[in-house]
């Protein structure tokens, strides 16, 4: 028997695919007048919220205006329980290809994002995945292995990024941020002390108020009124009692990350997680990123394949929409990207409409505005797919080219392939 109710899984998948497959047009415009998928040559060509980018992976030969910001769902439909919304989350949010190197050290690790935490938050990211380690007598953000941070896998002290989060919450008093920690911190009270020193304890959502049996979370309105606007989860169960940091898989289900999480037609649960259709946890984290991050492919991944996977995971979750969508290189797409998909995930749940932009504040559930979908055709050529380059500018300035960052990750793949031999020799 299908887990879908009234064909919701099929309807969501089909609407996502139709919208994303229809994104394609090229026209002459400039001076901030260019709309989504119009041809562009610089950041100033596109209207606010769009940037100028291309996607050779789908055969696009020229840059077009590409969506670069999420629509806040609470700005349209407010006052529902926190677990009714879907939020954008960045995988390894700290692993920024443009992050400064440590003095005298060449970093050897994978990169998953291309801009700062502050930029991510300003562009609508509301969930951050952070890997925290004991390093240099402090707690650092590292993209490492075997539970140990090295100088060539280290990025920066964790408090630096947490202070960016504090500044954002302070300046945006109605916003809620979630942090998920891959936790390799062993010092006593390390996490609780770290967050207090960053000034984030005043926003802390207490574990005692988190639903443990699959009930609804408090409404976003109540969370804002009580200033419980920071949710923090750890991968270490003992820290819930020791430090008051919630154990992640006690409160959410999660699909498998890496390549198993992007395999078409399959959405298995992560081994630490309960089954995705479990009723004992009211949050659902959907991972969608390959094991090895490849920048030039991200724009293609964030189109029809992701839209289809949302439908697959919706069905695996017992007709429950994911609450967090975690991706690499969140800005890269062939048009609407993860931002359009988020709208398509929020719309049916929040207001019964195909997309968030069709929702009408204060109207009855299912009362939707007519939304015009662009159906345009971009400039294409037969050789564009072989081009590994890319140009990106706009609300987020990428200071490295796509090709140079891809080369870094390819070098890391080679280095990590030699690691077992090096460990054996040592």
From Swiss-Prot:
Domain of life per record: Eukaryota
Residues that span the membrane, as ranges: none
Subcellular location per the Swiss-Prot or TrEMBL entry: Cell membrane
Record keywords, A-Z: Cell membrane, Glycoprotein, GPI-anchor, Lipoprotein, Membrane, Signal
Keyword Signal carried by entry: yes
Residues linked to a glycan: 151, 255, 370
An annotated Gene Ontology molecular function: phosphoric diester hydrolase activity
Region (Disordered): 258-277
GO biological process: lipid metabolic process
Sequence ranges assigned to domain PI-PLC X-box in this UniProt record: 76-232
Parts forming coiled coils: none
InterPro entries reported for this sequence: PI-PLC_domain, PLC-like_Pdiesterase_TIM-brl
SUPFAM superfamilies: PLC-like phosphodiesterases
Signal peptide per UniProt: 1-28
GO cellular component terms, semicolon-separated: plasma membrane; plastid; side of membrane
Residues excised as propeptide: 405-426
Main subcellular localisation: membrane
Membrane topology: Lipid-anchor; GPI-anchor
Gene3D superfamilies: Phosphatidylinositol (PI) phosphodiesterase
Name of protein: PI-PLC X domain-containing protein At5g67130
């Amino acid at each position: 028997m299908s887990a879908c109710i009234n064909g919701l899984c099929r309807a969501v998948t089909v609407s996502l695919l139709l919208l994303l497959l229809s994104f394609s047009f090229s026209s002459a415009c400039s001076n901030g007048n260019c709309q989504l998928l119009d041809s562009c040559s610089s950041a100033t060509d596109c209207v606010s919220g769009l940037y100028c980018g291309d996607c050779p992976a789908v055969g696009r030969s020229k840059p077009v205006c590409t969506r670069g910001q999420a629509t806040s769902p609470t700005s349209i439909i407010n006052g529902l329980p926190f677990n009714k919304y879907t939020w954008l989350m960045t995988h390894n949010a700290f692993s920024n290809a443009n992050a400064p190197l440590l003095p005298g050290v060449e970093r050897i690790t994978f990169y998953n994002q291309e801009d700062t935490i502050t930029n991510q938050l300003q562009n609508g990211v509301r969930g951050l995945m952070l890997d925290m380690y004991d390093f240099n007598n402090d707690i650092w953000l590292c993209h490492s292995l075997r539970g140990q941070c090295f100088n060539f896998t280290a990025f920066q002290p964790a408090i630096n990024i947490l202070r960016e989060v504090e500044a954002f919450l302070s300046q945006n008093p109605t916003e809620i941020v979630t942090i998920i920690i891959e936790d390799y911190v062993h010092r006593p009270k390390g996490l609780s002390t770290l967050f207090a020193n960053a000034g984030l304890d005043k926003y802390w959502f207490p574990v005692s108020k988190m639903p443990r049996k699959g009930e609804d979370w408090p409404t976003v309105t109540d969370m804002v009124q009580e200033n419980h606007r920071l949710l923090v989860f750890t991968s270490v169960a003992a820290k819930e009692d020791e430090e008051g940091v919630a154990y992640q898989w006690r409160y959410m289900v999660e699909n498998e990350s890496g390549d198993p999480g992007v395999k078409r037609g399959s959405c298995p649960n992560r081994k630490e997680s309960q089954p995705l259709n479990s009723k004992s946890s009211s949050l659902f984290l959907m991972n969608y990123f390959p094991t090895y991050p490849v920048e030039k492919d991200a724009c293609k991944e964030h189109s029809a394949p992701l839209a289809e996977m949302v439908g697959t995971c919706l069905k695996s979750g017992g007709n429950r929409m994911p609450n967090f969508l975690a991706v690499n290189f969140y800005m890269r797409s062939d048009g609407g990207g993860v931002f359009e998909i988020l709208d398509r995930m929020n719309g049916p749940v929040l207001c019964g409409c195909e997309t968030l932009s069709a929702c009408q504040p204060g109207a009855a559930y299912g009362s939707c505005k007519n939304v015009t979908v662009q159906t345009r055709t971009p400039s294409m050529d037969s050789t564009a797919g072989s081009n590994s380059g890319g140009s990106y500018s706009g609300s987020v300035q990428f200071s490295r080219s796509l090709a140079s960052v891809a080369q870094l990750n390819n070098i890391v793949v080679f280095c990590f392939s030699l690691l077992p031999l090096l460990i054996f020799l040592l």
